[in-house]
Amino acid sequence: MLMPKKERKVEGEEVIRVPLPEGNQLFGVVEQALGAGWMDVRCEDGKVRRCRIPGRLRRRVWIKVGDLVIVEPWPVQSDKRGDIVYRYTQTQVEWLLRKGKISQEFLTGGSLLLE
């Protein structure tokens, strides 16, 4: 029995809203993967936090070194720990750069952030 092939949508761009950090959330860049769902993330405030990838993200999204993410610091140990809330795609990162929400220096290792 033959199954029909899946149709692929290639017409134009899909318009989606790019999520921005809210409340105490911060932009961050993944610096090192530690294993077991933990990563070291350099945040926009200049601190490096050990961040956990919650199960709802771990099963759906692959997070690599160099990815731009949204980090939510923990209420306790907020300077050292946090949760990764969202990972941006390359297209979304380019949009954030164009709109001036982040700077190229922040992505490449500096701590300069535009707003």
Swiss-Prot record:
SUPFAM superfamilies: Nucleic acid-binding proteins (SSF50249). InterPro entries: NA-bd_OB-fold (IPR012340), RNA-binding_domain_S1_IF1 (IPR006196), TIF_eIF-1A (IPR001253), TIF_eIF-1A_CS (IPR018104). CDD domains: S1_IF1A. The keyword Protein biosynthesis applies. GO terms for molecular function: RNA binding; translation initiation factor activity. PROSITE patterns: IF1A, S1_IF1_TYPE. Residues 14-89 form the S1-like domain. The keyword Protein biosynthesis applies. Keywords: Initiation factor, Protein biosynthesis. Seems to be required for maximal rate of protein biosynthesis. Enhances ribosome dissociation into subunits and stabilizes the binding of the initiator Met-tRNA(I) to 40 S ribosomal subunits. HAMAP family: aIF_1A. Belongs to the eIF-1A family. This is Translation initiation factor 1A. The lineage of its organism: Archaea, Methanobacteriati, Methanobacteriota, Thermococci, Thermococcales.
